[in-house]
Amino acid sequence: MKLPQPLFQGTLIRRYQRFLADVELEDGTVVTAHTPNTGSMMGCACPGNRVLLSKSASLTRKYPHSWELVQADGTWVGINTQLPNLLAREAILDGTISELSGYRQIRGEVPYGSGSRIDLLLSGERGLCYVETKNVTLVKDGVALFPDAVSARGQKHLRELMEMVRQGHRAVNLFIVQRADGVALAPADAIDPVYGRLLREAAQNGVEILAYRAEVTRTEVRLERALPVLL
């Protein structure tokens, strides 16, 4: 998936109020950028980090800049949580995610569960497949970890995926690791032990747990390979 161009390089001053970040651009201008990520962004929101921002052409946006990438531990990291659904759809269609091939239709944001919307609903002769995507930006010692903060929403999604399996459907929790230095994925038990317990319970009860790593450059984010999941 091509990133919007041009991207503006700068230095992170601070992230605050979850969705805002102050960035000093290369010309010395300080801008406030929208941060499309609700997580803690542990390890990715350190003052002084190099970041790349896109800029909307809209004249009505209060904050025209959006934070797209950050350089952490020497690698570019995609922090935009709106991308995983698009990346997953693209990778399903081009065959990269072979586990999810063979479906005729892909729909997004379909209501299901207890007031939730499934990220991707695949359908066809194989029946229905409910796919929940999760963006992963935290890596420690080569292992990508999720979540980076306690995630009641993520816990709820796992329970709903288990319910879909009980109803006879296929259900998949798909982790999208938007950085190239992760060699495996594991639940972040030290951060959210409840999520870790539920992820293992979901796997034991028929929910498929997949992880795919993206190649992230200044111009493109593209899923490239599956990662082992350590439960």
Curated annotation (Swiss-Prot):
One of its GO terms (molecular function) is DNA binding. Transmembrane segments: none annotated. Pfam families: SfsA (PF03749), SfsA_N (PF17746). Disulfide bonds: none annotated. It comes from the Bacteria. NCBIfam families: sfsA (TIGR00230). Belongs to the SfsA family. PANTHER family: SUGAR FERMENTATION STIMULATION PROTEIN A. This is Sugar fermentation stimulation protein homolog. The lineage of its organism: Bacteria, Pseudomonadati, Thermodesulfobacteriota, Desulfuromonadia, Geobacterales.
